[in-house]
């Protein structure tokens, strides 16, 4: 994050670690941002998690509910928090980090795929609805990324810096130019 902030130069950032599924904490975070900066130009929705791989018939429904809350509802909550300020200014950008699993659905990934597919639907509808307010939406579909998201490191996956660079490019181009970015490591062969 520090490196990205330095690369972007004359920009103002505020970061805070909190439970994104807690609506009061989301609201408090946004209130702090409004007080500090007056508005929000870009929101990157990147919170998410995955559960163990299960067949659809074996999915723990409580785990699935939590996954929907984290991977979908929380991002929508953040959008709802900042949208009014963007709409008032007729300017802004939402960058929603989805997953390449939205482009195909593999066995044993039902919980994760369902929640990311739901967020993709919200994001595509938002793209159409936000157009009237001159607000852009960019959906990022990363494949495997070598982070602690997975239990085991895989140097053949995308580097986090690669994904961050694409997000940065999306933010820097003219408003409304980039709608979807698909990033896949060479190792993945489940292309739709």
How should each PLM-predicted stretch be described?
Residues 17-28, 61:
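The beta1-alpha1 cofactor-binding region of Rossmann-like NAD(H)/NADP(H)-dependent oxidoreductases
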Residues 59, 105-113, 125, 153-154:
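Active-site loop-to-helix junction immediately N-terminal to the catalytic Tyr of the SDR YXXXK motif
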């Amino acid at each position: 994050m520090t490196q990205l902030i330095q690369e972007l130069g004359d920009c103002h950032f505020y970061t805070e670690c909190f439970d994104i599924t807690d609506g009061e904490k989301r609201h408090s975070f946004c209130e702090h941002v409004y007080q500090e900066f007056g508005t929000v130009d870009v929101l990157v929705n990147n919170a998410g998690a995955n559960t163990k791989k299960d067949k659809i018939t074996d999915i723990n429904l409580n785990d699935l509910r939590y996954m929907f809350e984290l991977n979908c509802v929380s991002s929508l909550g953040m959008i709802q928090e900042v949208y009014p300020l963007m709409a008032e200014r007729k300017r802004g950008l939402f960058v929603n980090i989805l997953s390449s699993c939205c482009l195909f659905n593999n066995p044993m990934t039902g919980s994760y795929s369902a929640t990311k597919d739901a967020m993709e639907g919200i994001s595509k509808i938002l793209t159409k609805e936000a157009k009237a307010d001159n607000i852009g939406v960019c959906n990022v579909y990363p494949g495997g990324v070598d982070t602690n998201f997975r239990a085991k490191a895989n140097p053949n996956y995308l580097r986090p810096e690669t994904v961050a660079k694409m997000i940065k490019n999306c933010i820097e181009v003219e408003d409304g130019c980039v709608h979807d970015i698909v990033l896949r490591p060479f190792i993945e062969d489940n292309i739709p």
